[in-house]
């Protein structure tokens, strides 16, 4: 049975454009009507299940913060609010280092951010002893990465 191009929706007289999407259930499943919703012989009268779109996962540094916490204080936990604060802190520091490294790269008329720019950005942003420790840990991480390749 051919379908009519414009069907009326449950609202007052406003025509619905096009046909329903593939996989979406029809409004009414009446055996009198010969559309998608009608029961067909031999099919068992089953409807297709509507697949919901999966929501995008939120990225966070939570698992890494937790691992570091357990290295430093194995018997200490962290609340979700404190984890949120720590995640915001890590994101903020990351953004600051990245923007400073980008500024240094453009000041030196280069197009690629290297480990040298990151190191200089860390030295500029972090105070004294903290900068020294961050640089040494960063150098150690880069060395470990290059040797594992």
Swiss-Prot record:
It is found in: Nucleus; Chromosome. InterPro entries: Histone-fold, Histone_H2A/H2B/H3, Histone_H2B, HISTONE_H2B_site. Glycans are attached at residue 136. Keywords: Chromosome, DNA-binding, Glycoprotein, Isopeptide bond, Nucleosome core, Nucleus, Phosphoprotein, Ubl conjugation. A motif (SPKK motif 1) lies at residues 4-7. There is a cross-link at residue 144 (Glycyl lysine isopeptide (Lys-Gly) (interchain with G-Cter in ubiquitin)). One of its GO terms (molecular function) is protein heterodimerization activity. A motif (SPKK motif 5) lies at residues 24-27. Pfam families: Histone. A motif (SPKK motif 6) lies at residues 30-33. Belongs to the histone H2B family. Core component of nucleosome. Nucleosomes wrap and compact DNA into chromatin, limiting DNA accessibility to the cellular machineries which require DNA as a template. Histones thereby play a central role in transcription regulation, DNA repair, DNA replication and chromosomal stability. DNA accessibility is regulated via a complex set of post-translational modifications of histones, also called histone code, and nucleosome remodeling. The nucleosome is a histone octamer containing two molecules each of H2A, H2B, H3 and H4 assembled in one H3-H4 heterotetramer and two H2A-H2B heterodimers. The octamer wraps approximately 147 bp of DNA. This is Histone H2B.3, sperm.
């Amino acid at each position: 049975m051919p379908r009519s191009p414009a069907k009326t929706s449950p609202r007052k007289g406003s025509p619905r454009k096009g046909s329903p999407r593939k996989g979406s259930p029809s409004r009414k499943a009446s055996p009198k009507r010969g559309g998608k919703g009608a029961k067909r012989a031999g099919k068992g009268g089953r409807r297709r299940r509507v697949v919901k779109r999966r929501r995008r996962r939120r990225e966070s540094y939570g698992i890494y913060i937790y691992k570091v916490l357990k290295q430093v204080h194995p018997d200490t936990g962290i609340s979700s609010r404190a984890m949120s604060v720590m995640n915001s802190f890590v994101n903020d520091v990351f953004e600051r280092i990245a923007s400073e490294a980008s500024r240094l790269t453009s000041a030196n008329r280069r197009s690629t951010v290297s480990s040298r720019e990151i190191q200089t950005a860390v030295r500029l942003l972090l105070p004294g002893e903290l900068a020294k420790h961050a640089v040494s840990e960063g150098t150690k991480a880069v060395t470990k990465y290059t040797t594992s390749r």
